[in-house]
Amino acid sequence: MRNSEEQPSGGTTVLQRLLQEQLRYGNPSENRSLLAIHQQATGNGPPFPSGSGNPGPQSDVLSPQDHHQQLVAHAARQEPQGQEIQSENLIMEKQLSPRMQNNEELPTYEEAKVQSQYFRGQQHASVGAAFYVTGVTNQKMRTEGRPSVQRLNPGKMHQDEGLRDLKQGHVRSLSERLMQMSLATSGVKAHPPVTSAPLSPPQPNDLYKNPTSSSEFYKAQGPLPNQHSLKGMEHRGPPPEYPFKGMPPQSVVCKPQEPGHFYSEHRLNQPGRTEGQLMRYQHPPEYGAARPAQDISLPLSARNSQPHSPTSSLTSGGSLPLLQSPPSTRLSPARHPLVPNQGDHSAHLPRPQQHFLPNQAHQGDHYRLSQPGLSQQQQQQQQQHHHHHHHQQQQQQQPQQQPGEAYSAMPRAQPSSASYQPVPADPFAIVSRAQQMVEILSDENRNLRQELEGCYEKVARLQKVETEIQRVSEAYENLVKSSSKREALEKAMRNKLEGEIRRMHDFNRDLRERLETANKQLAEKEYEGSEDTRKTISQLFAKNKESQREKEKLEAELATARSTNEDQRRHIEIRDQALSNAQAKVVKLEEELKKKQVYVDKVEKMQQALVQLQAACEKREQLEHRLRTRLERELESLRIQQRQGNCQPTNVSEYNAAALMELLREKEERILALEADMTKWEQKYLEENVMRHFALDAAATVAAQRDTTVISHSPNTSYDTALEARIQKEEEEILMANKRCLDMEGRIKTLHAQIIEKDAMIKVLQQRSRKEPSKTEQLSCMRPAKSLMSISNAGSGLLSHSSTLTGSPIMEEKRDDKSWKGSLGILLGGDYRAEYVPSTPSPVPPSTPLLSAHSKTGSRDCSTQTERGTESNKTAAVAPISVPAPVAAAATAAAITATAATITTTMVAAAPVAVAAAAAPAAAAAPSPATAAATAAAVSPAAAGQIPAAASVASAAAVAPSAAAAAAVQVAPAAPAPVPAPALVPVPAPAAAQASAPAQTQAPTSAPAVAPTPAPTPTPAVAQAEVPASPATGPGPHRLSIPSLTCNPDKTDGPVFHSNTLERKTPIQILGQEPDAEMVEYLI
C-alpha cells in the first residue's frame, strides 16, 4: 500500500545521506564496509529474517502516517543547514578523537551493520520506536557523538549526561545527530510496548494501555549489565535538559511490583527482543495458570533474536507477560511453525489480530499484576535473558553472521527450562481440563471481544489525543531541532574560532620568533654593513681629499696656464702692434733718411762753402788783425789823449757796460723765475685735467653699470638679449679699462718726467746763480757773432734731439737690436730698467725733435748732425737737439771727475765764437791732460759772444766762424787711469767739416756702444754717438755701465747724473696719436 511503497524510499534517502556523509568525512578504512552495507541496504531485502526487517501491509489509518511523513519531510528540509559546518566538525572530530577514545569506544563493524540494517528496516519508524534505538545502544554500540538516554558508565553517572554529551560529543554529521535527537525526544512521549510494524495505528494506543510510565523506564536505566538483582536497581529520573518530567505519574501503580526491572533487563539484554513477536498471536493464557513452560519461550526467543532489529527488544519487553502463560497454550503444534516465518506471517495477519496484540499485552499486564508471586520467576527469566544477551554479543562480534546462524543459540537455552516441565495427569482429567479451558477461553474470548470493542473506542479517542500530542511534540521537536542546530552551529563556530585563535596564537608566536631571528640577523648584517660602509666612507673621504687636492692643483695649473696664455696672447698682440709700429717707423725713417740725405748733400755743399768762408775769414781776420792793430794803436793814442785831456767819458762808458751786464743778469733771473712759475702752473693744470678726466671716466663707468643693471632686470627683455648686452658691456668695459690703464700709465710717466725735468731745472738754476759772477766777468770781454747762427740754437737742438732719442730710442733699437723687446714693464727684467727710463709709453710723441723755444733769439733753427751708418746698423744718427735757453746756459760738456771711469765727450761746435763761457773753467779744472774739454751748449746769445777763441781745445778746433753747428760725439769707457791725450778725437780746424764722418766716431778701443742719456728731460750734459758694435758685443741691447757720471758743480754748469745702467728702450707710440706742439713747447 502507500505506506509500504513510501517506506523504502524515505528510509533509503536518509540512509544514503548518512552513508554519503560517512564516506565523505569518515575514516577511509571504514568506507569499504559501509559501501557493502549500502549495497545490502539498497538490495531486495535484509539477509536476516527479522520481525521488523520486511514490513508487511500496514494499516490504512492515514493520520499518524501523514503526520510522520510531514515530520520526515521537515527533517529532510532542516538537514542541509547542518551540512554547512561539516568540514569544521570533521576538524574538531580529528582534534578531539584521542580524548573521546578514553571514555567511549567506537562501534565495531557488526554494530554499525546492525544499526544500518535497523535504519533501513525502520524507514518511517515512529518516534517511540526510534527512541529505543538510542536508548538500547550500550557502550559498544553507541557511535561517537550520538546522544543516548542511557549512559553505561561503570563509575558515576552524571545527571546531565545528555548535556555533557552534547558539549563533548564529536559529531560526524550534524544532520544525523539532529535526527536522532528528534527521534529520541519524541520517543519518550510515545512509548509503544509491543509492535513490529512501526507505523501501525495501535502503536500510540499501546503507550497508554501500558501501565508502566516513562519515569519507570528511566528508573531502570541506571544499573550496570552485571547487576541482576532488584536491590541493585536505583530510581533515576530523566536527565535535566530532557523534556520528560511532565509525563503522567503512572509509576505509582507499578512501583510496588517493580515492573521497571523487567524493562531495564530488556533494555540491557538485546537478545530477547523478538520474544514478543513469537508469542504475540497466541491465545490468551488462563488466568490462574502457573505458567511452568517458560523454557519454551526462551529457545524461541533465542531462536528468533536478531542483532539487526533493535525494536525487537521493545516487543519482547511488551510481550513478556504473555510468555508466562501455561505450557499447554504454548506447546500446540499449530503455533510452532510460526517461529521460522514469523516475520512473514506477521506481515499477513489481519487487522483484528494486530489490534488484539496490544490488548493481549494489556490483559497480560493485568494478569501479571494480579500475581505478585511471579517476581522470582521474572528474576530467573531476567538472568536467562542476561545470559542470552552475552551470548548474542558474542555472536555480534563475528563478522557477517548469516541469518541461519542465529538458530545455533537455541540448544543452549533449552536446559535452563527443565524446572518448568508440566506434571503428568490422566487423560480424562486432561480432557475435562481442556473442556474447562475451552469454556473458560470462550468466555474469556467473549469478554475480551467486548473489552476489545471498548478498547477500540478508547483507541479512537486516544488516537485523536495522540494526534494532538504528536502535533505538540512535533512543534516541540521543531523547536528542539532549531535550538539544537543553533547550539551545534554556535558550538561548532566556537570550536572553530577557538581552534582558529589557537592556530593564530601559534602562528603569531612563530612569527614573533621569526621576527626576532630576522631582527637579530638584520642587526648583525647592519652592523657588518655599517662597519664596511664606515671603512668605505673613510677610504672615499681620503680619496676625495686627494682628488680635491689634485683638482685644486690642476685648477691652479689651469689658471696659471690660462693667465700665461692670456699674457702670451697679449704679448703677441703687443708685439704685433709694435711690429706694425716699427714697420711704420721704418717707412717713416726711410723717408726721413731720404730727407736727411738731402740735408747731408746740403751740408756737404755748406761745408764746401764753409771752407771757402773759412778761407775768406782767414783773409778777413788777417785784415781785421791788421785793422785791429791799427785801431789799437789809434785807441792807445786816443786814450793817451783822453788821459791827458779829459778821462770822464771813458769811465762813463765802462760804467755803462757794467750796469748793462748787471741789468741783463737780473732780467735773465726774472725770466727763469717766471718760467719756473709757468711750469708749476702748467703742472697744476695737467693734474687737474687728469683728475677731471678720471672723474668723468668713473661717472661714465657707473652710468654704464646702471644701464646694464636696468637692462638685465627689465622683465620685457629676454635672457639672451640681456646676456648679449651684458657680454658686450663687459667687453667694452674691458677695452675702456685697458685704455684708461694705458692712459694712466702714460700720464704717470709724463708727470714723472716733468718732475725730473723740474729737478734738473732747479739744479741748473742753482748752479747758474753760483756761476753768475764768473759769467759776467767772462762775458764782459765777448761780443756776439751775428754773422753765424747761435751756438745756443745748435746746442739746444742737439740736446733736444738727444733727449728725444732718450725718450724714444726705437730707431737705434731697430738698427742695433734684432731681438726686439717690448716696452711694457712686465716684459722687462730688473737689470734692464734704468732709473730715469720710463717703462710705459709716454704720451710725449717720440721720434719728434723738440723744437727750441728760445725766449731771446726766437730762433727755431736746428743744426742737423747725422751719420751715414744707419743702413748698416752700425751707428746711430744724431738727431737735431734743441735745448731751451735757461737749460742751455749750463755747460753741457762737463768735466767728468769719476775715478772708476772717465768718459771723454767731445763736442765739436761749428761756430767758433759760440763757445760756452763755462767751458774754459771746465777745461782748466780737468785734473789731467787726458780730460777732454767738451764744447757744450752755450749760454744766452747775449753772453755767447764773450767767449775767447782759445778758451778750450774745442774752441781751437772750431775756429772757423762760419763752420756748421755739428758735433761728433764719441763716448768710450776707459780704464781708471786717466785716458791719454791721443784717445781724444783731434779735430783740426780744416777737418771740422768731416767731424760727422763715421771713422771719426770710432773709439780707439772696442767698447760697446753707448746708450743714450736716460733722462727724458732736455739735459744739456751729454751728446750721444753710436760706435759700430764689435763682434764681441753681439746683437743684444748695447749697454754702457757708467758707475759715476757726475759733473763738477764747481767747474761746470751741468746737472749731476746718478745712473747705474743706461738702456735703450723702445716706448711704443700709441697709434693715432699725433705730436702735441704745445706739450713740446711746454717741455722745452
UniProtKB/Swiss-Prot annotation:
InterPro entries: Angiomotin, Angiomotin-like, Angiomotin_C
Biased amino acid composition, Polar residues: 854-867
Record-listed cross-link Glycyl lysine isopeptide (Lys-Gly) (interchain with G-Cter in SUMO2), residues: K594, K595
Coiled coil: 429-689, 721-751
Location of this chain's protein in the cell: Cell junction, Tight junction
Modified residues (Phosphoserine): S714
GO biological process: actin cytoskeleton organization; angiogenesis; blood vessel endothelial cell migration; cell migration involved in gastrulation; cell-cell junction assembly; chemotaxis; establishment of cell polarity involved in ameboidal cell migration; gastrulation with mouth forming second
GO CC, alphabetical: actin filament; bicellular tight junction; cell surface; cytoplasm; cytoplasmic vesicle; cytosol; endocytic vesicle; external side of plasma membrane
Single annotated GO MF: angiostatin binding
Tissue: Expressed in placenta and skeletal muscle. Found in the endothelial cells of capillaries as well as larger vessels of the placenta.
One matching Pfam family: Angiomotin_C
Keywords (A to Z) from UniProt: Cell junction, Coiled coil, Isopeptide bond, Phosphoprotein, Tight junction, Ubl conjugation
Region (Involved in interaction with YAP1): 410-751
Cited function: Plays a central role in tight junction maintenance via the complex formed with ARHGAP17, which acts by regulating the uptake of polarity proteins at tight junctions. Appears to regulate endothelial cell migration and tube formation. May also play a role in the assembly of endothelial cell-cell junctions. Repressor of YAP1 and WWTR1/TAZ transcription of target genes, potentially via regulation of Hippo signaling-mediated phosphorylation of YAP1 which results in its recruitment to tight junctions.
PANTHER family: ANGIOMOTIN
Complex formation: Component of a complex whose core is composed of ARHGAP17, AMOT, PALS1, PATJ and PARD3/PAR3. Interacts with MAGI1.
Entry's family note: Belongs to the angiomotin family.
Additional observations: 'Motus' means 'motility' in Latin.
Protein name: Angiomotin
Natural source organism: Homo sapiens
Lineage, top ranks: Eukaryota, Metazoa, Chordata, Craniata, Vertebrata
Gene: AMOT
